[in-house]
Amino acid sequence: MSTAITAKIISQAGKANPPSLVALYGGTLGERKASITEIENDLKAVGLNVIEFNARRYLSESDLCLPLVQQIVTELKGNAGNNGTTSDLVNRINESAPVILSTSLSSENRVEMIHQFDSAMKKLAAISIQKKPLVITLQGIERAVSGSFIKISEFISNYIN
């Protein structure tokens, strides 16, 4: 990571060592967006994979994890390459993701689908992230349903960390 990016993150977070999670507060929405865009461009310039997730686009969703999963899978798929293994993993993720968010499944079926999703997502992330590290930026999360940030943070730490 370039020192300019690190300096920006340190100044935004106000800490000596930047945490794995940095939140931008203060300033106008435009100023925060400009800072995030600048940081994203710097991250891309040094060869990192950047996913820009704007929660405002999905405010009608009760759970933001599914749109985030779709964005992450699209990015990881492109980074991992299009081969048989990648396609199989993506198909398993796409098949199981909406199902595990459903509340109408029996617990046995739900456990099976969670295992399928968990296994496929971790394998796809491992293949992709070895080739090109991944950074996810979240915007507009303050307007989402209460608890959305915690769910997204847990999801990212479970599969991408």
Language-model regions, residue ranges each:
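P-loop NTPase nucleotide-binding core
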Residues: 20-22, 34-131
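Glycine-/small-residue-rich active-site loops that bind phosphorylated ligands and cofactors
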Residues: 31, 59-60, 143-144
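P-loop (Walker A) phosphate-binding loop of NTP-binding proteins
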Residues: 27-28
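N-terminal pre-Walker A segment at the start of P-loop NTPase domains
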Residues: 1-13
